[in-house]
């Protein structure tokens, strides 16, 4: 879910990222493990694209889903070009779209791997992702990180020298758990409205749903 400008008037303007590790069971059905999540407010376009490319490589991702309407269109364009990482000196090769011929034509490298899902929201699509997410949660097909209240114990058990890290380093490791808790709160506080046999989701005044949108897109694509 893409938003590039933070807003003082609205609390719903943030780019939300979820990383999903799919694990099949003996029947071939997959469980979605949301192993990482992050929210970025006020991030500039080039920095967001670089962040996505770093995560795509580091986590060995197979696909990336982008909310391609509006502000997501320039993100799509930049992902379809080479991206230089000034920290590592590496140049990430172009990626192409896998589900939208119009975006595929915009990629200058026709041999680039087709791994980007362009999400073009509509009333029907929003209805479908809402139903899919609800069903996935009810059937236990989505697993989240543990509560932020338990994360220090988990991190201490899995990261050698955790207690010697700086407060900033500890907070960076805790943030995925904190953002997971915030995502769950969003899900609890959403309001659902049925119009013309389609479900519309909207947030209560002062609440937000950027994490919900990213999570629902992620699960639907997976």
Feature map (PLM): residue ranges:
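Conserved RecA-like P-loop NTPase helicase motor core
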Residues: 113-132, 136
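RNase H-like, metal-dependent nuclease domains and their acidic two-metal-ion catalytic environment used
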Residues: 1-101, 127, 131, 144-148, ...
């Amino acid at each position: 879910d893409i938003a590039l400008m933070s807003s003082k008037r609205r609390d719903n303007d943030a780019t939300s990222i979820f990383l999903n590790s799919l694990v099949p069971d003996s029947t071939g059905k997959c469980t979605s493990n949301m192993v990482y999540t992050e929210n970025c407010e006020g991030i500039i376009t080039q920095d967001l694209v670089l962040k996505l490319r770093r995560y795509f490589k580091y986590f060995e991702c197979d696909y990336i889903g982008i909310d391609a309407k509006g502000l997501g269109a320039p993100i799509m364009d930049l992902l379809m070009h080479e991206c230089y990482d000034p920290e590592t000196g590496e140049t990430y090769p172009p990626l192409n779209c896998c589900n939208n011929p119009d975006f595929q034509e915009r990629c200058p490298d026709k041999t680039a791997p087709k791994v980007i899902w362009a999400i073009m929201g509509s009333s029907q699509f929003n209805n479908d992702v809402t139903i899919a997410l609800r069903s996935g949660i009810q059937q236990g097909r989505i697993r989240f990180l543990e509560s932020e209240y338990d994360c220090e114990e988990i991190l201490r058990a899995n990261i050698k020298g955790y207690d010697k890290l700086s407060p900033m380093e500890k907070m960076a490791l805790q943030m995925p758990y904190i953002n997971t808790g915030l995502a769950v709160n969003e899900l609890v506080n959403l309001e659902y409205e049925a119009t013309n046999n389609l479900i519309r989701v909207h947030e209560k005044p002062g609440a937000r749903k950027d994490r919900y949108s990213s999570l629902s897109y992620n699960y639907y694509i997976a």
